[in-house]
């Protein structure tokens, strides 16, 4: 689904990571682990093709990717249901009703997104992933603003996505109880040795 070879990325014109290598297939999840400022967001943005790599290559179809950033990116004047219907039409993707049920948004579906709490907006933002029809989810701290119950809803959506042959790459500090692999990113510096993902079941 995606393969990364000797990838280097930069932030503000300065190299932050180099020699990043991994491959990910359908049904697999990968979490990026490292201290704040190491370059996790920069790496995710590069993998999502939102910025060019400094070096190396990314193999895989960009049209397979759905990206969820720190910002929720919801349309505040549209209702919850209208937001999901909009994105479903844009991506020719899945059924908004399924996403609404998965993230427990039934009682909120007719409420404008601008009237939602921070946690509710985050649930709506993550529900969008389900209507894109994209196989590879790239997620930057997806559980921000979520309470414990909502984290479990998100974890369930990830499990369902993986079970259906999808894949996920994410930066998160929350244990989602999902078996996956971890890619350790070393201390901030311009050059890093090759980074190999290791099995660490239950971390995700």
Swiss-Prot record:
Domain ABC transporter: 2-204
Record flagged with keyword ATP-binding: yes
Enzymatic class: translocase
Primary role: Part of the ABC transporter complex CcmAB involved in the biogenesis of c-type cytochromes; once thought to export heme, this seems not to be the case, but its exact role is uncertain. Responsible for energy coupling to the transport system.
Subunit structure comment from the entry: The complex is composed of two ATP-binding proteins (CcmA) and two transmembrane proteins (CcmB).
PROSITE patterns the record matches: ABC_TRANSPORTER_1 (PS00211), ABC_TRANSPORTER_2 (PS50893), CCMA (PS51243)
Keywords: ATP-binding, Cell inner membrane, Cell membrane, Cytochrome c-type biogenesis, Membrane, Nucleotide-binding, Translocase, Transport
Binding locations of ATP: 34-41
GO molecular function, one term: ATP hydrolysis activity
GO cellular component: plasma membrane
Protein name: Cytochrome c biogenesis ATP-binding export protein CcmA
Catalytic function, reaction form: heme b(in) + ATP + H2O = heme b(out) + ADP + phosphate + H(+)
Membrane topology annotation: Peripheral membrane protein
GO BP terms, alphabetized: cytochrome complex assembly
Family membership noted in the UniProt record: Belongs to the ABC transporter superfamily. CcmA exporter (TC 3.A.1.107) family.
């Amino acid at each position: 689904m995606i393969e990364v070879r000797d990838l280097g990325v930069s932030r503000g014109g300065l190299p932050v990571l180099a020699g990043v290598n991994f491959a990910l297939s359908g049904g697999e999840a990968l979490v990026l682990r490292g201290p704040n400022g190491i370059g996790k967001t920069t790496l995710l943005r590069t993998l999502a093709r939102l910025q060019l790599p400094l070096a190396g290559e990314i193999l895989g179809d960009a049209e397979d990717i759905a990206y969820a950033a720190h910002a929720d990116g919801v349309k505040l004047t549209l209702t919850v249901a209208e937001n999901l219907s909009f994105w479903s039409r844009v991506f020719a993707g899945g059924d908004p009703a399924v996403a609404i049920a998965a993230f427990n948004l039934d009682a909120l579906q007719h409420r404008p997104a601008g009237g939602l709490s921070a946690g509710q907006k985050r649930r709506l933002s993550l529900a969008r992933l389900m209507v894109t029809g994209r196989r590879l989810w790239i997620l930057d701290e997806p559980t921000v603003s979520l309470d414990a119950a909502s984290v479990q809803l998100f974890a369930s959506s990830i499990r369902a996505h993986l079970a259906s042959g999808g894949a996920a790459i994410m930066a998160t500090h929350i244990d989602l109880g999902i078996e996956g692999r971890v890619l350790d990113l070393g201390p901030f510096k311009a050059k890093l040795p090759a980074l190999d993902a290791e099995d660490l079941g239950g971390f995700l």
